[in-house]
UniProtKB/Swiss-Prot annotation:
Originating species: Gloeobacter violaceus (strain ATCC 29082 / PCC 7421)
Name of the protein in its database record: Protein translocase subunit SecA
Lineage start: Bacteria, Bacillati, Cyanobacteriota, Cyanophyceae, Gloeobacterales
A single Gene Ontology CC term: plasma membrane
Localisation per UniProt entry: Cell inner membrane; Cytoplasm
Keyword Transport: yes
Amino acid sequence: MAWWNKLFGDPQERKVKKYQPRVAEMNALEAEVAALSDDQLRAKTAVFQKRVADQLQGVDLDALEIRERRRRIDVALDGVISEAFAVVREAAKRVIGLRHYDVQLIGGLVLHEGQIAEMKTGEGKTLVATLPAYLNALTGRGVHIVTVNDYLARRDSEWMGQVHRFLGLSVGLIQQSMTPSERAQNYAADITYGTNSELGFDYLRDNMATNAGELVQRSFNYCIIDEVDSILVDEARTPLIISGMVAKPAEKYMRANEVATALERNTHYEVDEKQRNVTLTDEGFIAAEQMLSTEDLFSPRDPWAHFVFNAVKAKELFNKDVQYIVRNDEVVIVDEFTGRVMPGRRWSEGLHQAVEAKEMVTIQNETQTMASITYQNFFLLYPKLAGMTGTALTEEAEFGKIYSLEVTAIPTNRKVVRTDMSDQVYKTENGKWQSVAAEIAEMNKNGRPVLVGTTSVEKSEVLSALLKEKGIAHNLLNAKPENVERESEIVAQAGRKGGVTIATNMAGRGTDILLGGNPEYMARLKLKEVLFPALVIDDEDAFSPMMRLLNNGNSRGTGFAATSKKKALPKAEIFPCELSESTKQQLKAAVDYAVAMLGADSQPALQVEELIAVASEKGPTDDPVIQHLREIYRAIYKEYQVVTDREHDEVVKLGGLHVIGTERHEARRVDNQLRGRSGRQGDPGSTRFFLSLGDNLLRIFGGERVAGLMEAFKVEEDMPIESGLLTKSLENAQRKVETFYYDQRKQVFEYDEVMNNQRKAIYAERRRALEGQDLSAVVREYIDQTVDEIVRAHVNAERPPEEWELPALIQDLQQLIPLLENQLDAVKLGEFSAVELEEDLKSQALLAYETREEYINAIQPDLMREAERYFILNQIDTLWREHLQQMDSLREMIGLRGYGQKDPLIEYKNEGYELFLQMLVEVRRNVVFALYHFQPQYNPPIDPDYVDSEYV
């Protein structure tokens, strides 16, 4: 396509150009806005809100279809865009000392239009989000900013939240440890920061609430997703599931593990690494059945197939220190994209239990799904969705087809001068690792910082051992608990002179790597070093009491070791220099003042983290503790900055940060994220990938051609080969994998779309009952439809009355409605036409309902409404759970329809629809039955003035 671009220009450049006139308007307003006082600047928000409200006056937005609602809001906001962006730019300059560059204004416009902005590492994505967030919050309908972990959500809400608060908007933050009331309060804010999982689980929990007071979220409006590729692509196949515990057949998992251990690969079973699946051969079935003393693994009375297949998968496809680690008698999943551990996350369908049996740890209970949704369908609930990432263009087609999101590449503020060197491929793993270690040693000799990306915990430790042999000091960042708790600290100093950092999957790491080191972060760590021992409650686990839950696997989280926060302090070598005596004295005085004001050993760790975060920013504050800490923070920062600035210049002369990739990832995007760690904001840098024929990508997706070349030329194990053919083969392999996984995600989306339509319908019905919107009318509908279904089951309108099954009809109706006992006569009913019969029975059923309503409300006013709400919610929840299981079973077996020349997806849609209709029939019938049958107990109030002497 290069000739096309030369002829017509780069389409991305053309896209960006259309925003230039708007940016020119904003720049023209800059001097005028800068002349405003703080109060005048803040008052602009109320002016904008009124102008937007005037535009929307008389429009019932909630009554509009989603696309029309978004269009109306965008038209209203269009009149204030340039002024609003100019105001946010000035506020950021005053409050946090950052001014939006023109390219960041373009990024803000792209996000406001509901697109994905591709912005390179270090280009200030976090700051860009303040622009569209402020603008869209002017409607009062709320904005959600989504990050990949709690730490980033908290950091961004504290840091960027200062800009919004300065301008008079409220800022909310959703964290794992919050109570429902705290969540509701934070969701009610103008702008709310949170993680994708917390927002998704809150949505599911809201749709399991038993009274309206438990709801925490309001209607969705606008969402900005940071690291959008990580959430909408990498996590797309992972559903959010809320489940309940069911009994575990632990002995079956243990026995199946023994069978899997005895079975041999390629004899008893075959492994498809590409599909991540296993298949038993005929010999395998026979051997397994003999070992288990059963005639059939699929026997309904004593099924074993599910357990054996999972045990073989656990043996062959799930490796310790790659897909999971073992900690505190638990199997803890490692996120393959970020390298973080995920306590509380479990593989479903018995797979986690199979891995527990393999590792001989306690086998935990199985779970039953109560509610679930994929990220794909969750984020499509927002009328307007936008995202930011450093790498999106490689997935542009997927974003367009599944999410209807356009991708626009935002130009960098300074030209990228990084050198990306060609890949080196080695015959063996050992040859590759030796060469990586040699390259690190060469760079380290000159003091040039090196960042090495690995794909698993196991491989990071192999390299770490090699570097120890060579006497090269280095930092290790992987999912092991002892490394995770120092994550930000390790990344913050990765650009120091002579620094060597080994990291497992750098995607999504939130701290910038600055050449020479990050003085701001180091100054914050210095405050942490002295404040935590003085202020934090003794023996409080990392991130407060909730962290204990995370480390026991009872909740979801981002993996920190259960180490006392007082002990989890930065190592001394991170600091660039010893502080001067006067600064040390000033620091001691600030800590003493904080202790005097707040109390020794009295604060939760999160509270102290927040104190340090606010002290290190520039927002206005009246808090004397923060004022003292801010003063000393600035003094420490200045001393550290002298050293880091000097180191920065030295590292630039050496060539900047050198990034080494030790394996090509399945997605080019993740490789690009690793490369993007070098050469940020115009700094020099270089990258190189070292590969071997044993790497998963080459081994599974077409390394035979390269292996053949190496054999033909008798290449030694420590001799690398570089060639255009090789690079092309690797890129083709990655494209194959990307296409393969895209097809899988597309299939997940298509199948979940069936569930999504059902989910929307059932949740809407549930919300109608929960919020009590005329429950009597809902129940009358249920009665009407239930009687209709019973009549049609026994009466064929095209047949004469003599052929109607009237005795059976009467029996069914009297079982449903006891008040109709002895009220129905088959002879009289036979005199009606089918239509008249139906109308007569419906009117009798409704009369019986009104009689019941009068009787029940006489016991306690409005008791009937409460009963209706309870029975509707109870039946929807119970039958929806059963329906989810049925749909899972249908999904598992529907693929076999392909062998019968039928489209499995169409079959799934049709049969799933039938199951859903049947569930709705059961919900209605069960609710009607319960309302006609339940007997409330009458408990008369006791008159305290009356005491019967007989009982004294």
